[in-house]
A protein has these predicted regions:
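Positively charged n-region of N-terminal signal peptides that target proteins for export
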Residues: 1-4
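Bacterial N-terminal signal peptides
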Residues: 7-16
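Sec/Tat signal peptide C-region and signal peptidase I cleavage site
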Residues: 18-22
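Terminal, regulation- and interaction-focused segments at domain boundaries
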Residues: 23-73, 81
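A mature extracytoplasmic/lumenal domain signature
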Residues: 61, 76-78, 99-102, 131, ...
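Compact, glycine-rich, soluble single-domain proteins
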Residues: 66-74, 78-121
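Beta-strand/loop substructures that line and gate deep hydrophobic ligand-binding cavities in soluble
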Residues: 124-151
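C-terminal partner/receptor-binding element of secreted or periplasmic proteins
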Residues: 143-174
Length: 174
């Protein structure tokens, strides 16, 4: 009798387990999605605390990029844009369009030579005040993208761009 109970119990557990897993996944799907999104955001973006005040950080980034020969476009006041769109208590956010010289041209040449599509870099540095009142600088995590590149030539160029970005932010971020 006990020989039959164990196999029957295992069979019942095997048949019921997918149902329990399906119920658990339905209950935890939103949490799993949030965790995966947070992991993706952590990998994609480089967020660092500034050593300076808000406006000083914006000015320092613009000056540092300009000294290095980067193109620097007009700073977008995202807080003002959100306020005009009706957002109350919009956080302080400024977006500085800037990129190392010919960064996207270098990527385009690799794309053309390899026949593989490579999207351009967004070439933006964002300065914001977080919920704790700290000035933060956020940009694309080019160093991570370089490590994740599927072929050597792309990894090399992305690594160079990451080093240029790091040099531009030296002394501004922690």
């Amino acid at each position: 009798m006990t020989r039959l109970i164990l196999p029957i119990s295992l069979l019942a557990l095997t048949l019921l387990a997918p149902t329990a897993r399906a119920e658990m996944s339905a209950q935890d799907a939103a949490q799993v999605a949030r965790i995966r999104q947070a992991q993706l955001m952590t990998a994609m973006f480089d967020l660092r605390k500034s050593r300076l005040g808000f406006e000083e950080t914006v000015t320092a980034i613009r000056l540092s990029a300009g000294k290095k020969g980067w193109r620097v476009g007009p700073t977008q006041d995202a807080q003002a844009d959100m306020a005009r769109a009706g957002v109350k208590d919009a956080p302080r956010i400024k977006v500085i369009p800037t990129c190392p010289p010919e960064a996207n041209q270098r990527l385009a040449r690799i794309s053309q030579a390899s026949g593989k599509p490579i999207p351009p870099l967004p070439c933006r540095v964002t300065v914001l005040i977080d919920k704790d009142g700290h000035v933060q600088v956020i940009k694309m995590n080019t160093a991570h993208l370089a490590r994740a590149a599927k072929f050597d030539q792309l990894a090399h160029v992305m690594g160079e761009i990451a080093a240029e970005e790091e040099a531009m932010l030296k002394g501004i971020v922690e």
